[in-house]
Amino acid sequence: MGQKVNPNGFRYGITKQHNAIWYAEKKDFSKFLLEDQKIHQFFEKLVRQYLIGKVEIKRDQKGRVFVGVHSAKRGAMLGQEGKNIQTLTASLQKFLRQKNKDIKIDVINIDQPELNARLLAEQIAVDLENRKPFRIAQKFAIRNSLKAGAKGIKTAVSGRLNGVDMARTEGYTEGEMKLHTLRQKVDYAQATARTTYGAIGIKVWVSLGEILDGGKQ
């Protein structure tokens, strides 16, 4: 029987770079891993506000933490003269309960948010929460992504669609989507829409073509 695997985890270390890049001794590993989880939780709350598509974490030997935040609203996230990013850094230190922690947040602009699976999934979630029909919400995201240059896109929504009693899954696929080909550059993300009928899960796969030179993206 065929088993499904997360397309991101399937490609990490092969054609996709890990989101966390650091080394730690055995005694520190669990502490750093928990810190990473908390950093992701912190930015999870800001995804829709700043259109955050990806968060990368790096550490050096001196214990400094470098957080790379990929955002489609770079200007809004930085704020006037970088004041907002200073506030976010202080809030993150407080969230981690380490006010003296050396943290540097770098905001990287997302030029084409229509090709980012996370942002597409969140957009579908927002549309569903605003009572837009699930078919129209998916087709709108697919059309925008293909128009922006995606080679293929696949979407799926699951739950009490349109408020019916029995939950089901419906989705669409357009263009090429070679999930078994490791050199195929596939971006995958999940999101949840909180509707009056309950939670609806959203999955989005975006194919950006093949990586032929063996380089990691």
Curated annotation (Swiss-Prot):
Q: Where are the transmembrane segments?
A: none
Q: Which Pfam family, any one, appears in the UniProt record?
A: KH_2
Query: What keywords tag this UniProt record?
Result: Ribonucleoprotein, Ribosomal protein, RNA-binding, rRNA-binding
GO cellular-component terms in the record? Answer: cytosolic small ribosomal subunit
InterPro entries in the cross-refs: KH_dom-like_a/b (IPR015946), KH_dom_type_2 (IPR004044), KH_sf_prok-type (IPR009019), Ribosomal_S3_C_sf (IPR036419), Ribosomal_uS3_bac-typ (IPR005704), Ribosomal_uS3_C (IPR001351), Ribosomal_uS3_CS (IPR018280)
Query: Where does the record place the KH type-2 domain?
Result: 39-111
Q: Which GO terms describe its molecular function?
A: mRNA binding; rRNA binding; structural constituent of ribosome
Which residue spans adopt a coiled-coil conformation according to this UniProt entry?
A: none
One biological process term from GO is:
translation
Q: Which SUPFAM superfamilies match?
A: Prokaryotic type KH domain (KH-domain type II), Ribosomal protein S3 C-terminal domain
Query: What task does this protein carry out?
Result: Binds the lower part of the 30S subunit head. Binds mRNA in the 70S ribosome, positioning it for translation.
Q: Into which family does the record put it?
A: Belongs to the universal ribosomal protein uS3 family.
What is its quaternary makeup? Part of the 30S ribosomal subunit. Forms a tight complex with proteins S10 and S14.
This protein's name? Small ribosomal subunit protein uS3
Which species is this record about?
A: Mycoplasmopsis pulmonis (strain UAB CTIP)
